[in-house]
Amino acid sequence: MKIRPLHDRVIVKRLEAERKTASGIVIPDSAGEKPDQGEVLAVGNGKILDDGKVRPMAVKVGDKVLFGKYAGQTVKVEGDELLVMREEDIMGVVEA
């Protein structure tokens, strides 16, 4: 199954958080916080403005993005947990 987001929505896959502290202690899944970084897998056409024009998306497929802890709606697709969120929920793009 493939998901194509509409309008100003994006599909993001969370990046795995570091499961080990600097001193070597392994953090169990139940104790760790959900990562707030992800990779954009798909983007919609853009936000429809009040005048009917479409503002293009600022993010693109492959971008590494930062988002809030509670951003987006979680969906399962072929065993993967993905987030569907509005572009405005993205706080920034991580540049290498």
Swiss-Prot record:
Q: Which GO terms describe its molecular function?
A: ATP binding; metal ion binding; protein folding chaperone; protein-folding chaperone binding; unfolded protein binding
Record's keyword terms, sorted: Chaperone, Cytoplasm
Identify one Gene Ontology CC term for this UniProt entry.
cytoplasm
Q: Which InterPro entries match?
A: Chaperonin_GroES, Chaperonin_GroES_sf, Chaprnonin_Cpn10_CS, GroES-like_sf
Indicate where this protein resides in the cell: Cytoplasm
Q: Does the keyword Cytoplasm apply?
A: yes
At the top level of its lineage, which domain of life is listed?
A: Bacteria
What Pfam families does this protein's entry cite? Cpn10 (PF00166)
Residues of the signal peptide: none
The record's subunit annotation is: Heptamer of 7 subunits arranged in a ring. Interacts with the chaperonin GroEL.
Q: Which PANTHER family match?
A: 10 KDA HEAT SHOCK PROTEIN, CO-CHAPERONIN GROES
Q: What does this protein do?
A: Together with the chaperonin GroEL, plays an essential role in assisting protein folding. The GroEL-GroES system forms a nano-cage that allows encapsulation of the non-native substrate proteins and provides a physical environment optimized to promote and accelerate protein folding. GroES binds to the apical surface of the GroEL ring, thereby capping the opening of the GroEL channel.
Family per UniProt? Belongs to the GroES chaperonin family.
Descriptive protein name: Co-chaperonin GroES
Q: Which organism is it from?
A: Aromatoleum aromaticum (strain DSM 19018 / LMG 30748 / EbN1)
Tell me the organism's taxonomic lineage.
Bacteria, Pseudomonadati, Pseudomonadota, Betaproteobacteria, Rhodocyclales
Annotated gene: groES
